[in-house]
Amino acid sequence: SCLTIANFWLPEIAGKFARACPDTPLEITVDIVSRVAAMLAANKIDIALYEGAVPDARFRAREFSSYRIGWLAAPDHPLAKQKQIPLSEALRHPLLLREKGSAVRSTFDSTLLLHGLKAEARWTSVNSQALVRGALGGAGICVIPEIIAANELAAGRLVRLDIAAEPMVNKNFIVYHPDKYLSPQASKLIEIVLTVSPGDQAVK
């Protein structure tokens, strides 16, 4: 499983599977999206819960949820009250970013590439919560899944910046080899994933 899915969807999935198939242990590896893709391609895992663009058309990918990625900052940030902030202006401020190879960073970098821009990170972390804490402390703008900072946003401790660019959304997929035999337990896992609650961050 990729990291954001592991934090917000995997507990429900794992719990439902344990109740449905109590005699089948579910072995789970949580890692960044690039390494999850490599494990699936190498047949080291049978099924992946994957965020963002599916890397290989050979895989069967079925969407089950999605989440928004936001530009978030403290309420006293210089850009906090501005409207339709140009991307180039946002990039002049310190950025707190996920590491390269993560689904969130890949979507962010792809958005900038569409505009011919690149970003330099002031902070880079595998831990989105560390980036939230950095933004709360005034270290800069964090670019993370909004679901991770839902409490801070609701309380007004962080605000969404109004960036003049396409909304950043990552879709979540269950991915597997279409020609590989699926046991009844694997088929049940797929069924559970496809019926899991999409969550408050579901993007219609």
Q: Where do the language-model regions lie?
A:
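Central regulatory/effector-binding core of bacterial HTH transcription factors
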Residues: 1-57, 125
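A late-sequence structural motif
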Residues: 9, 72, 159-202
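Short secondary-structure boundary segments
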Residues: 52-53, 75, 146-148, 165, ...
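Flexible hinge/capping segments at coil-to-helix
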Residues: 56-95
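Secondary-structure junction motif
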Residues: 79-80, 94-115, 146, 182-186, ...
